[in-house]
Amino acid sequence: YLNQTEPLFDVLRVTERGFSGMVADHRNILKIVEDPSLAATNIAVQYDVTAEPQIVLTLQGPDDKALTDYLSEHRESLVQVLEKAERDRAVKFAEAFSEQRVAKAIKSTFGVDMTVPKGYVLAADEKDFLWARYEYPTASQGFFIYSYPYRGKESLSPGALLAARNEFAARIPGPSDGSYMTTSEAFEPDYRMFRMEGRLWCELRGFWDVHGDFMGGPFVSHALLDKKKGRVIVAE
């Protein structure tokens, strides 16, 4: 859900002869092996073969068509395996080098344990709203967390989630006086509800704008129902 096309991965293609040294130590590797003696196409998964952390997928098939057909049929599954490996690495790195000040603020404000990557700083911390940001020389990224009362199923509807998002996003100022973040009306956000680890979640994917200025981009938010405290917690 991006405002411009971007590849899922950066791909480096090498021959078997060139697969050595630093190339063989890449963290995500997909080997394609054509072997006419094979009766069917199969795939094997290995971890930490020449480096750590690393995932190596070896796809073997009797001919070009069999390999291509397998990739086409199982594309989504293969992408999910590689994406999970990337997420696991990111989580492991964040846990090793976390930003404790922001994590403690989240725990204090919302009672939630959250690992925050190093480099984030608190931009706002209120009783029902927290905003953390990471500044680059030419760009900025960040996340915000907020909560609002749960008053029944309607509190998790797309309309309620959007209304809450716009209310709290307005607390994030834009670059010019009087400007603030809001949800773009150019495209209706995608909404889905799902359960994970026994908890009910709602997801919104859409685009944000800055009211009163020219800025925008994609966003994804996840809302969690906290029945014990009668509230909805949203992280974006």
Locate predicted features.
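Structural recognition of the beta-strand scaffold that forms the well-ordered cores
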Residues: 114-115, 203, 233-235
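Structured segments of extracytoplasmic/periplasmic soluble domains
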Residues: 81-85, 171, 207
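N-terminal "mature-domain start" segment
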Residues: 3-4, 8, 94-123
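Signature of long, low-cysteine stretches enriched in small and polar/charged residues
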Residues: 14-66, 172-230
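Acidic, contiguous N-terminal accessory segments
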Residues: 1-19
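Solvent-exposed alpha-helical segments and adjacent loops
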Residues: 1, 33-100
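Secretory pathway targeting signatures of secreted, lumenal, and periplasmic proteins
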Residues: 1, 117-174, 209-211
